[in-house]
């Protein structure tokens, strides 16, 4: 007897095959090509329905991990009396797990049986009369989404990609705003140059251009919604005596178009900043409470994701963003940087120059703990308690280093402190005799010191003379050795020369004797 275990999105099904060796057939697809052939070959012997979507997800996770759940074990126990039977399963890991249950099945998990399961899944509505094809498709889609979310641990509120893109766009907007604001000041400055010194804010400058237009309209224009009263008065006075040139209406239209761009960019930047704050509060509330939204977002963007940032040690978080300076310092063997992006946190900005490195190190350590809690905690509180506690600790450490009062410590009760009585009687008088020049003891001490110093000088002088004599003797010995060597070499040369001459004279003497 052959049973086939089939996992569906609705539950577990155990099918009984008419042909005992169907799983060994080489032409399964031909034998099971139509729903009629499938229904004639297989009959449902047992079905265990999933109670809910959550239980379906748990069961599927167990199958993926190769585990036998309680629900599946209960279904298989119904067939424990079936002896000399085979159970065909699709997953070899699940087959090994079923073998450990000591059931009277010969578990079969072969690649050849995949065609069998393909044919069964294509004709499930025919085998399970209570389920339609539409119902199975809907349940399969929902279960697939649930399984995907579970694997990715996906949560729409924790998508840190939004933070990476938002902080990058915020930086781009800042650059564009600065460029446009500088351009509009240079452009409108030809008409009203004094206005740049009076109205320092770029957005207010653009709003004034949009509201006022020509400088000649300043006295008649109400700028109370744009500027403070004293600035408005100064602007109107400067407009009366301005040294700027006149511009045409066409010029003013283009300048006002640029002013509209600056205002729109500023409004969108504010909206984007609020969005970034909300995202950071949802994704990394403890990190935000410790270092702020912008610094936290830049850290996440630099590392790529919150999980990557949480995996980094505190020392890496401390110098994140200063990699170029770090490698240059390592190459030149100079001091490595103490901080990177984290330098812009408000807590480090409050520290004095000598304490910035210490606070940066402590802040990085606390930030590392906070971001790990944000990244890996399954349940979190509405209030970022960990981040606030860590911030208080860093602030207290900063006050301690700066010599200020520490917040949160128990102060002593002033009433319980015992104060010593102050003696207001006459204190010890100054001894004027100690200043006299003729003090004998002082003179004796000074004589002893002088004698000691003279002995030291003599001793040093003797050592110096001894060393000089030794050096002279060594030099003389070297010189004598060199002279002896030179004499010896000269003598050897003379002997060789004389011998050569004697050798040359002998043939001449022989010739003379023959003659």
Swiss-Prot record:
GO terms for molecular function: snoRNA binding; snRNA binding. Pfam families: Nop (PF01798), NOP5NT (PF08156). Residues 460-499 have a biased composition (Basic residues). The keyword Chaperone does not apply. It is found in: Nucleus, Nucleolus. Keywords: Nucleus, Ribonucleoprotein, Ribosome biogenesis, rRNA processing. Residues 445-456 have a biased composition (Acidic residues). Residues 283-403 form the Nop domain. One of its GO terms (cellular component) is box C/D methylation guide snoRNP complex. GO terms for biological process: box C/D sno(s)RNA 3'-end processing; endonucleolytic cleavage in 5'-ETS of tricistronic rRNA transcript (SSU-rRNA, 5.8S rRNA, LSU-rRNA); endonucleolytic cleavage in ITS1 to separate SSU-rRNA from 5.8S rRNA and LSU-rRNA from tricistronic rRNA transcript (SSU-rRNA, 5.8S rRNA, LSU-rRNA); endonucleolytic cleavage to generate mature 5'-end of SSU-rRNA from (SSU-rRNA, 5.8S rRNA, LSU-rRNA); protein localization to nucleolus; snoRNA guided rRNA 2'-O-methylation. SUPFAM superfamilies: Nop domain. Residues 428-515 are annotated as: Disordered. Signal peptide: none annotated. Belongs to the NOP5/NOP56 family. Required for pre-18S rRNA processing. May bind microtubules. This is Nucleolar protein 58. It comes from Yarrowia lipolytica (strain CLIB 122 / E 150). The gene is NOP58.
